Amino acid sequence: MRKFFKVKRINEDIKLPERSTRNSSGYDFFAIEDVEVPPYKFGDNPFMVATGVKVKTEENEFLMLVNRSSNPKKKKLIMPNSIGVIDADYFENPDNDGEMFFTFYNVSNEPVQIKKGEKLGQGIFMKYLKIDDDTANGERKRGVWFHRCLKN
């Protein structure tokens, strides 16, 4: 099954990711609240923008999170790793219920406003391959590094 879900901490109706057109490869993600992204200072953690969404992927798939092409020019928002990779075992993550976040650096000198319902970026489902003698058998025990940064 490949599907988006609302995370448990969200009680209100939120917009789940959706494709804008029939030929869109990515699903648009939306901010669940108004936030202000402060200007980046060297050494700052990236600013986390909540989506309120988790994703279930099929085996040998991941969801790639990418920035909107207009964000760097219009809002001066860049993603620190260029992309985000959401593995199948991140679903139901005990640290945050598998909620996905978009991480940004604001490279302007002024705070940037993101409004509730505004498009943040896109998620693109991707297949991946494994080597023939792959022996990975571990399980995800915790979330990723940013579970410590949720308070921005």
Where are these regions (language model features)?
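DUTPase catalytic domain/fold
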Residues: 1-152
